[in-house]
């Protein structure tokens, strides 16, 4: 049994590793998009204009309230009806990026809220504009505070990248499904998939824990 498993694992691993490459592409692409959009939602939520704040809250509540898989289906299957056709990989990145942007927005919001108001008032008394206060004071402090939850969000996104398999993105889970169907070697295939996900997520988990310990000392 162990020998059979190793033989099959050696045969299947190159196929699954191609899926790993796509998983990394989806995760990194969606992560970058989620950071940009999350920062936008967070800044809109701090706007002095009430309509802008309402738009931010509405977007966050709507996106958070709709399952990720439905958002992926909408991007991949519905947007083409409006003339915007995307390939599966792009749809997966956009769908996951939008879905996770609301969590990134909360990370940024918590970071902004952690900034001591006295520091902001001191900066204003020195004649700094609101833009400079945001760029030179609030953003660096907010990012520092948001780093640990940002790491946890990245780990969740890595695992949820498997949902992109539902729109035929050939990431790790999809590659494994096709391999299992064609070979009937379910135990070998899904064991390898689990091991590969752990190999990607555990280093991130350890890095987040290390970062949290360092932040706690400061």
Regions found by a protein language model. Give the residues of each.
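Transmembrane alpha-helices and adjacent helix-loop boundaries
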Residues: 1-218
